[in-house]
């Protein structure tokens, strides 16, 4: 018989830097899950990823206080900022442009994110990412 699911917990945790402090501790503690067990397992699974890169994680909590978790790809905005070496997006994206991104860079990001995106193919994913880039004040070339 399958375990009874108590709930899902969605967090963004820096790769390799999970610790019991907020937001992880309180979120897992409310469900009675072992916080240190999650931190150790998460850090072990994210060893190959660039340290500090924020990763969305979905934790499934079960009635017997056990859990499983799925690590997703980094947010599109983080990957776009990383591709064009940007610290933050524009405060006014319609007037202030902060950088340029090419279609090739967007395709590379799309290939990384495709399994977590709601897009049928790479071209649709590129168009979605181009919209995200524009909303950050980044000029999109070739899309």
Curated annotation (Swiss-Prot):
Post-translational modification: One or more lysine residues are methylated.
An individual GO BP term: translation
PROSITE patterns with a match to the protein in the record: RIBOSOMAL_L11
GO MF assignments: large ribosomal subunit rRNA binding; structural constituent of ribosome
Signal peptide: none
Gene Ontology annotations for the cellular component aspect, listed alphabetically: cytosolic large ribosomal subunit
Keyword Ribonucleoprotein: yes
Entry's family note: Belongs to the universal ribosomal protein uL11 family.
Entry function: Forms part of the ribosomal stalk which helps the ribosome interact with GTP-bound translation factors.
NCBIfam families on file: L11_bact (TIGR01632)
HAMAP family noted in UniProt: Ribosomal_uL11
Subunit structure: Part of the ribosomal stalk of the 50S ribosomal subunit. Interacts with L10 and the large rRNA to form the base of the stalk. L10 forms an elongated spine to which L12 dimers bind in a sequential fashion forming a multimeric L10(L12)X complex.
Protein name, as recorded: Large ribosomal subunit protein uL11
Source organism of the structure: Delftia acidovorans (strain DSM 14801 / SPH-1)
